[in-house]
Swiss-Prot record:
<dbReference type="GO" id="GO:0016655">
    <property type="term" value="F:oxidoreductase activity, acting on NAD(P)H, quinone or similar compound as acceptor"/>
</dbReference>
<keyword id="KW-0830">Ubiquinone</keyword>
<keyword id="KW-1133">Transmembrane helix</keyword>
<keyword id="KW-0997">Cell inner membrane</keyword>
<feature type="transmembrane region" description="Helical">
    <location>
        <begin position="120"/>
        <end position="140"/>
    </location>
</feature>
<keyword id="KW-0874">Quinone</keyword>
<comment type="similarity">
    <text>Belongs to the complex I subunit 1 family.</text>
</comment>
<comment type="subunit">
    <text>NDH-1 is composed of 14 different subunits. Subunits NuoA, H, J, K, L, M, N constitute the membrane sector of the complex.</text>
</comment>
<keyword id="KW-0472">Membrane</keyword>
<feature type="transmembrane region" description="Helical">
    <location>
        <begin position="312"/>
        <end position="332"/>
    </location>
</feature>
<dbReference type="InterPro" id="IPR018086">
    <property type="entry name" value="NADH_UbQ_OxRdtase_su1_CS"/>
</dbReference>
<keyword id="KW-1278">Translocase</keyword>
<dbReference type="GO" id="GO:0048038">
    <property type="term" value="F:quinone binding"/>
</dbReference>
<feature type="transmembrane region" description="Helical">
    <location>
        <begin position="78"/>
        <end position="98"/>
    </location>
</feature>
<dbReference type="GO" id="GO:0009060">
    <property type="term" value="P:aerobic respiration"/>
</dbReference>
<keyword id="KW-0520">NAD</keyword>
<comment type="function">
    <text>NDH-1 shuttles electrons from NADH, via FMN and iron-sulfur (Fe-S) centers, to quinones in the respiratory chain. The immediate electron acceptor for the enzyme in this species is believed to be ubiquinone. Couples the redox reaction to proton translocation (for every two electrons transferred, four hydrogen ions are translocated across the cytoplasmic membrane), and thus conserves the redox energy in a proton gradient. This subunit may bind ubiquinone.</text>
</comment>
Amino acid sequence: MSDFAFFALEALIKCIIIIAIFASLAGLATYAERKVLAYFQRRIGPDMVGPFGLIQLVADMIKLFTKEDIIPSNSQKFIFAIAPLISAICAFVSLAAIPMLPEFTLFGKVIQPIVADINVALLFVIGTSGLCFYAVFLGGLASNNKWSILGAARGLVAIISYESVGALALIAIVMLVGSFSLVDINNYQSDGFFSWLIFKQPLAFVLFIIALFIETNRTPLCLTENDAEIVAGYGTEYSGLRWGMFFIGEYASMIAGAILVTLLFLGGFNSFWIIPGWIMMIVKSSFIFFWYFWARAAFPQLRPDQVMKMCYLILIPLAVLNLLITALAVLL
């Protein structure tokens, strides 16, 4: 087998594995979120379907597959139909340039757990994950429903604003490391616990986490949905499998975001003491992923004006200040 054929086959297998694993993890995350929220609210959560309620995932999947798929008669039908697909595709494509685990040897071949190790991986991931919002905007606009349009418009304003915050935070990381490659950023933090970038860029870490909550539409910074104001927002008219595609795309983006935070700030998949790197990667990513649930349970929903004022009056000035300080530190 030629090197190109082996590379193509390896990339195809990796793509299939990533889609299968992360689609399954997205479903498992819904169960985890229910259990965590139930614990915070002194409830039991899912416990009737299967042991510890684990088969609830299968029940939900059957419901989504068998529920009637309704397309409103006054909607832009083609755009309405493909918007959920855009959400899921963009979320999974963004995973292609993210190194998941340390490299390992299989049948004499060195395998890198990454589909494409490109030298601008950080730009690729941020760009493709940002495209997920086109699905939200197009779905809300095509629904021809006032609640959907309001949710899409609110989300559009927020994502444009907070993408700037996240980008400015990441530029500081790139200035320190000198590379857009996520593998290089991971290797930069390989000298031990105190080489983690969270200690060198604590403000960038906080800014990026806040921007991540906006990009993944998570409480308390979610503007696209609000039961008391705009019902289900962009997803008001969606049902069945199409709604499920939005759901899978959102949770896949959350998982990708948690892995990205681990790679950028928490030492990535470097080993820690006697703990292997792959275990560290899973533990740290799971901890960041837990923050999504904790924030939803602990904090109230912010008003749109509060979210936007926080962005332009506090976060962007802080991001610019952090960038200037980092530039001075690099020059000196």
